[in-house]
A protein has these predicted regions:
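Beta-propeller domains
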Residues: 1-482
Length: 482
């Protein structure tokens, strides 16, 4: 970890850079008339709602007692089309409460950053802040009896109440010494969460953070890197934490030009994947070279009997390359299986499915172990945020080498779906998949529950939400009794 003097110097420099970036961001305003992430299906919601009389088609499984939560960017006030990036918009969480076979409510609430509190005319939310921004907009999950909204690159987690209200910006009771991540992964054997965290103000190191089942940080290990890589996600196996050090890195030029998301494709950055023993040191990391690409999301990983490590990922050919600066863009996103050889320090890549896809999820009771099924959202080649056409979900049988498709039909756009196992499950796919599906024609949204073992069949239940929920980022099921 950095010394107090280094931390103070970095904070001063960060404030100075932020001031220059803010000035140039104001100069961008008015230079662009439109932004696909501020209009059409992405047009932000303008109010917080609580709806209790929800129309249900089908039957909600009575075993489901908890909240489905999903978060995403949703500006709380006017946003400049020229200066807005989807990854940095104000966070809004959407939730549906299920109990006893009923949908008790839908709610949406902004995450109270300082900017959101000002826009809503409210006092600032309590709790300390970290990094250039306190916007939190990328993931939401339950851990240690609390609900947490998460972001990467410096911001602290935000603790939410049962009705999704912001309680506090909370570095896990003061035990977290730097920023966190949007993607911690829970070890199903120990209940610990593992995370690889990076800071926008620290270009030469990332951190391995371990969170106890009680919600307190028990380990923070600094790991040297170069160029400030954007590490959105990681993965765990029985013995390792997998680090994705890939060629999207911090760009001072982009920051100083006023663009709020200062990460760009860097062809000069060495692409590599690290195997960190869970209790090891930075010197113990085994770095394996991989052909240049970018991965937002691995699905799962595990170790083989011969000492190799399997990692299944959605691999973008490039990311944040070229002229598009409003959000993610790549031409190809196949689902791949990577085999990491810690002896040869190499990665071999095999395409499981060449069709574009994202948001891969397994049955997370199998996290870090050999598994059979993976679920993902179709992402057509050349995806256009202004005219999205991703109507399908995929189910991969990795043992049989087959794929099933659930197509919601033209004008019905699913996001990430999460697998929830049946309490009495014996088979890996005995459970439900759940997520939001936007109905473009009717400016509405359905919360859909699919039977995972009847993937191509009709939904088990569909709950109508009578407004359009803008496409978001990540969601999770938070059971009332974990």
């Amino acid at each position: 970890m950095s010394s107090p003097i280094e931390t103070a110097i970095r904070a001063t420099v960060t404030r100075g850079l932020g001031a220059v970036a803010g000035f140039n961001r104001s100069r961008l305003a008015g230079r662009k008339a439109s932004n696909p992430y501020l209009e059409g299906v992405h047009k932000p919601m303008e109010a917080e709602l609580t709806l209790e009389a929800l129309e249900v088609t089908g039957s909600i499984p009575p075993e489901l007692d908890g909240r489905y939560l999903r978060i995403g960017p949703n500006p709380a006030g006017p946003a400049s089309p020229a200066a807005y990036h989807w990854f940095t918009g104000d966070g809004m969480v959407h939730g549906v409460r299920l109990k006893d076979g009923k949908a008790l409510w839908y709610r949406n609430r902004w995450i109270r950053s300082k900017a959101v509190s000002r826009a809503l005319g409210e006092p600032e939310a309590p709790g300390p802040r970290n990094g250039l921004s306190d916007t939190v907009n990328t993931n939401v999950l339950g851990h240690a009896g609390a609900l947490w909204a998460l972001v990467e690159a410096g911001g602290y987690p935000v603790r939410l109440g049962e009705d999704l209200q912001t309680l506090a910006h909370d570095p896990f009771g003061g035990t977290l010494k730097g920023g966190f991540t949007a993607h911690p992964h829970q070890d199903p054997e120990t209940g610990e969460m593992h995370a690889i965290c990076y800071e926008g103000s620290e270009l030469n190191a990332v951190r391995h953070v371990v969170l106890s089942p009680e919600g307190r940080v028990t380990r923070e290990l600094s790991i040297p890197v170069r160029n400030g890589p954007s590490i959105h996600d990681c993965m765990i196996t029985r013995n390792y934490v997998i680090i994705l050090d890939l060629p999207v890195t911090f760009s001072l030029k982009t920051l100083l030009s006023g663009h709020p998301f200062p990460y760009r494709w860097n062809p000069d950055h060495r692409a590599r994947v690290g195997l960190l023993p869970k209790t090891g040191t930075a010197d113990d990391v085994i770095w394996c070279d991989v052909a240049p690409c970018y991965v937002f999301h691995p699905c799962n990983g595990y170790e083989t009997a011969d000492g190799k490590v399997i990692l299944d990922v959605c691999a973008h050919d490039t990311m944040f390359d070229g002229d598009r600066v409003e959000g993610p863009a790549s031409e190809s996103t196949p689902f791949e299986r990577w085999t990491l050889d810690p002896v040869a320090r190499s990665v071999s890549r095999r395409v499981i499915d060449p069709d574009g896809q994202e948001f891969p999820r397994p049955n997370e009771t199998r996290l870090g172990k050999p598994y059979r099924y993976a679920y993902a959202m179709c992402l057509p080649a050349g995806f256009d945020a202004a005219a999205p056409d991703q109507t399908r979900l995929f189910k991969h049988d990795l043992e049989a080498g087959t794929r099933q498709v659930h197509d919601f039909g033209m004008g019905h756009l699913p996001g990430e779906f999460v697998f929830v196992p049946r309490p009495t499950a014996r088979a890996e796919d005995d459970g439900w998949l759940m997520g939001y599906v936007v109905d473009l024609a009717n400016e509405a949204t359905d919360f859909v529950i699919l039977n995972a073992d009847d993937f191509e069949g009709p939904p088990q239940a569909s709950i109508r939400i009578p407004h359009r929920i803008p496409p978001g980022v990540h969601g999770n099921w938070a059971p009332s009794e974990p």
